[in-house]
């Protein structure tokens, strides 16, 4: 595995772009780390990322390139993809495959449009004043500059609509206000770090066997914060049921 991983990284370093082409218009597509919830659960119909790249490539306007960036944690967390995957993308004439270490902010800042299956990239795009297309059902899709697609057949019209779109920051601010009203304090980064340290040797292992006694110990150690999360979820369920009841009665 180590030899394979090093060979794949060598191919990435030697073949993936590490700079922007001056005055080149492009659509930005960040790849998801695989396997990942954003693909397998949120958008299973679109979990084949190579197919997504090819479908976008087919209908991209002639004066645009598609910049596809490898996920920076794909290698460290899950091993780099098979070299065949990268070669298939490199064959596409209107596609540039971007190195995982390249600064994503430069891509957000200079692109005309962001396309993402799911995840947070399309939400990030709004802070750079960029429109975006997504395939997953995500809460932030209520922002008008984010268009949800249900099939690849909607790509061409979606791209055309986004490229004509004028972004209004007030809608992003409204969404952030909604988030603030419906949020609660929970240090998820600290919780995930504790989880990784307990079960994955500080994130250095992937395929590990869980033991019941270790899980019980972990849950007991974090009982207070998990109880708080559970109460907030129950509160939200009650709120949703009240709203649904009122809508039904109307």
Stretches found by the model and what they are:
Residues 41, 48, 77-120:
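Donor nucleotide-activated moiety binding/catalytic core segment of transferases
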Residues 100-147:
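A donor-sugar binding/catalytic signature common to diverse glycosyltransferases
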Residues 96-99, 146-158:
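Short acidic-hydrophobic, aromatic-tinged amphipathic segments that line or gate anion-handling sites
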Residues 34, 73, 121, 139, ...:
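Short, glycine-/Ser/Thr-/acidic-enriched flexible segments
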Residues 12-14, 23-25, 152-250:
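C-terminal amphipathic helix plus adjacent low-complexity
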């Amino acid at each position: 595995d180590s030899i394979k991983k090093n060979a794949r990284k060598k191919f990435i370093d030697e073949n993936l772009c590490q700079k922007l082409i001056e005055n080149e218009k492009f659509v930005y597509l960040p790849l998801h780390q695989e396997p990942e919830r954003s693909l397998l659960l949120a958008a299973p119909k679109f979990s084949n990322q190579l197919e997504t790249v090819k479908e976008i490539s087919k209908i991209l306007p002639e004066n645009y390139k598609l910049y596809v960036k490898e996920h920076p944690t794909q290698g460290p967390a899950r091993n780099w993809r098979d070299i065949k995957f990268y070669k298939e993308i490199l064959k596409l004439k209107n596609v540039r495959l971007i190195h995982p270490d390249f600064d994503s902010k430069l891509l957000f800042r200079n692109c005309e449009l962001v396309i993402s299956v799911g995840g947070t990239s399309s939400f990030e795009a709004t802070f750079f004043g960029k429109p975006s297309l997504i395939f997953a059902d995500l809460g932030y899709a209520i922002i008008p500059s984010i268009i949800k697609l249900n099939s690849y057949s909607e790509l061409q019209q979606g791209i055309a609509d986004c490229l004509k779109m004028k972004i209004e920051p007030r809608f992003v601010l409204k969404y952030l206000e909604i988030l603030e009203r419906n949020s609660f304090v929970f240090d998820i980064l600290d919780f995930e770090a504790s989880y990784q340290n307990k079960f994955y040797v500080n994130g250095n292992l992937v395929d590990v066997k869980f033991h019941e006694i270790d899980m019980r110990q972990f849950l007991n150690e974090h009982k207070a914060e998990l109880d708080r999360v559970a109460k907030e979820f129950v509160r939200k369920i009650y709120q949703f049921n009240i709203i649904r009841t009122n809508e039904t009665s109307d």
